[in-house]
């Protein structure tokens, strides 16, 4: 049998799944059983499936009831005999005829009533509130119809057989009555199970479930009454009738009690199994959904198919997951606005104004000729170009564990070493700058950009007011990187770093850079030595106007490769 079929683990708590011993439990279907199909199943296939299940379940239940009734009437209570002491036209005419007629009319009537109550499902539309409430009454109507047919049989057969022998009266009333109640209850629970997909659709419109009993407690007490109360009443009535009418021998009385007890024990087990299964499957569905949430999967909601407190549990899970999804959307949006690292730091501890000194490396990137770019292209095209440009920057900065701290028009500022500490922020910044330069040259030749890299001590923290602040870094390396970026626009490599930055880098990274001119940047008092990727440093003639200081006779300098710089 497929791995989704369940059997009792312990009563009344939960139900164990029967499956091959593979070491793991199979995933529970959305409706709690593979018999009910998938949520994505076509409405027509679902109708055929449900109609077939209902027909088979009701017919089998009542056929078993007839077999048990025949055993009670012929073996448990042999005298008077329904075959020898009753008219043959009754035992071989009226009784079989009624059974066939009851099966035909009962099947027709139940099918018609069920189809009428579920017309909205047949028409493949959303039910109205009244239609949804009516759908919840289908199991009760099925149970009442089955109980009516058994009651009619008990009344008819009691009268007919009673006319032949009055001792038949208590026997038929007792046997047909007990079997009818148990069969009707079994049909109620089986119908409730089969209509889970329809109940799920009805619950979606907010209809209040209507049923024979309310809640888990009511359902449990009903099954207890049938599993425990009816057998005890049956044994008691057998003793009373034996003393009053039948005068059975001790052996016959024992056989009668055993025959009465055995079928009710089997029916009781089946009813309790159904009850435990109906109770356990929603819990199991929620449990497995919680496991998926624990693993980070927030993609799916549960199908609410139970009208008891278990349905409220399923709704509560869906509300919880929706809240988690909303939180993840806010977290993702927050991370996109301020950076993943800043967002993670804000979650770890309460944000506050102020900052702390950090040793960081800074990369500043700015497009060359941005004014001409904006005036020569449509605005939409400029936006698309900027998005491609910033995508390259963000990809490389994230790859090297940095933080894109700001987008300023067509420029961006990336920080390495804050808020997350890095053992070698200079290596990360220099590698990022080289990667950005290479990708821009190959992927976006129409968009050239200057890149400046600097490193040193900064203050990193939240700046602003208590109502509105942002995470940023303030210090000399930021200004230096911006000046180097402007200067780099006039160099073939479009990329410059300070010798101070190379001092903090590893030998492997330094081997990729060459030292060049010593210049004084605009707004700075002390000269710095420039560094550029190997074999790409070349000082342009107009650089004196850019750096804001005369280079005098020092237009050409020795280039040191593969070693740490010294001023």
Swiss-Prot record:
Main location: membrane
Transmembrane helix keyword on record: yes
One GO MF term attached to the UniProt entry: adenylate cyclase activity
Domain HAMP: 277-329
Membrane topology qualifier: Multi-pass membrane protein
GO term, biological process aspect, one: cAMP biosynthetic process
InterPro entries, per the entry: A/G_cyclase (IPR001054), Adenylyl/Guanylyl_Cyclase_3/4 (IPR050697), HAMP_dom (IPR003660), Nucleotide_cyclase (IPR029787)
Region (Disordered): 1-26
Record field: transmembrane: 57-77, 90-110, 142-162, 173-193, 221-241, 257-277
A GO-annotated cellular component: plasma membrane
Pfam families reported in the protein's UniProt record: Guanylate_cyc, HAMP
Keyword field contains Transmembrane helix: yes
Keywords annotated in UniProt: Cell membrane, Membrane, Transmembrane, Transmembrane helix
Record SMART domains: CYCc, HAMP
Cell compartments where the protein resides: Cell membrane
Domain Guanylate cyclase: 361-485
Family: Belongs to the adenylyl cyclase class-3 family.
Name of the protein described by the UniProt record: Uncharacterized protein Mb1354c
Organism: Mycobacterium bovis (strain ATCC BAA-935 / AF2122/97)
């Amino acid at each position: 049998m497929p791995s989704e079929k369940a059997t009792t683990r312990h009563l009344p708590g939960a139900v164990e799944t029967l499956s091959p011993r593979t070491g793991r439990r199979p995933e529970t279907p959305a409706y709690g059983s593979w018999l009910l199909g998938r949520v994505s199943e076509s409405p027509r296939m679902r109708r055929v499936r449900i109609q077939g299940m209902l027909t088979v379940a009701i017919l089998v239940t009542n056929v078993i009831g007839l077999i048990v009734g025949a055993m009670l009437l012929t073996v448990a209570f042999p005298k008077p005999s329904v075959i020898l002491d009753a008219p043959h036209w009754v035992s071989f005419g009226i009784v079989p005829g009624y059974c066939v007629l009851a099966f035909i009319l009962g099947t027709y009537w139940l099918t018609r009533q069920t189809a009428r109550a579920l017309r909205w499902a047949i028409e493949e539309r959303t039910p109205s509130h009244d239609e949804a409430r009516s759908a919840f009454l289908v199991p009760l109507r099925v149970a009442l119809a089955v109980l009516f047919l058994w009651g009619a049989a008990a009344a008819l057969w009691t009268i007919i057989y009673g006319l032949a022998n009055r001792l038949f009266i208590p026997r038929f009333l007792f046997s047909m009555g007990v079997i009818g109640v148990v069969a009707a209850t079994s049909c109620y629970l089986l119908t409730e199970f089969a209509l889970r997909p329809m109940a799920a659709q009805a619950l979606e419109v907010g209809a209040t479930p209507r049923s024979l009993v309310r809640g888990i407690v009511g359902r449990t007490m009903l099954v207890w009454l049938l599993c425990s109360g009816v057998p005890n009443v049956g044994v008691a009535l057998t003793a009373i009738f034996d003393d009053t009418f039948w005068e059975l021998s001790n052996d016959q009385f024992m056989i009668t009690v055993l025959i009465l007890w055995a079928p009710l024990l089997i029916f009781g087990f089946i009813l309790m199994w159904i009850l435990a299964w109906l109770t356990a499957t929603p819990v199991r569905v929620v449990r497995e959904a919680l496991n998926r949430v624990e693993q980070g999967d927030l993609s799916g909601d549960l199908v609410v198919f139970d009208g008891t407190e278990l349905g409220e549990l399923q709704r509560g899970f869906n509300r919880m997951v929706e809240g988690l999804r909303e939180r993840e959307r806010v977290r993702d949006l927050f991370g996109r606005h301020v950076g993943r690292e800043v967002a993670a730091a804000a979650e770890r501890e309460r944000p506050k104004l102020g900052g702390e000194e950090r040793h960081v490396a800074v990369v500043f990137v700015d497009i060359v000729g941005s004014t001409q770019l904006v005036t020569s292209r449509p605005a939409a095209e400029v936006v698309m170009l900027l998005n491609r440009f910033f995508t390259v920057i963000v990809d490389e900065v994230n790859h090297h564990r940095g933080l894109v701290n700001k987008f300023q028009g067509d420029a961006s500022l990336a920080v390495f070493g804050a808020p997350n500490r890095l053992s070698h922020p200079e290596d990360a910044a220099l590698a990022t700058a080289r990667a950005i330069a290479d990708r821009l040259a190959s992927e976006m030749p129409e968009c050239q950009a200057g890149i400046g890299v600097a490193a040193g001590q900064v203050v990193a923290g939240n700046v602003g007011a208590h109502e509105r602040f942002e995470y940023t870094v303030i210090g000399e390396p930021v200004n230096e990187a911006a000046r180097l970026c402007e200067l780099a626009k006039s160099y073939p490599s479009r990329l410059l770093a300070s010798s101070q930055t190379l001092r903090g880098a590893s030998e492997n990274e330094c081997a990729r850079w060459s030292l060049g001119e010593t210049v004084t940047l605009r707004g700075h008092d002390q000269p710095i030595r420039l560094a550029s990727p190997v074999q790409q440093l070349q000082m342009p003639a107009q650089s004196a106007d850019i750096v804001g200081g005369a280079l005098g006779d020092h237009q050409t300098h020795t280039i040191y490769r593969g070693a740490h710089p010294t001023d």
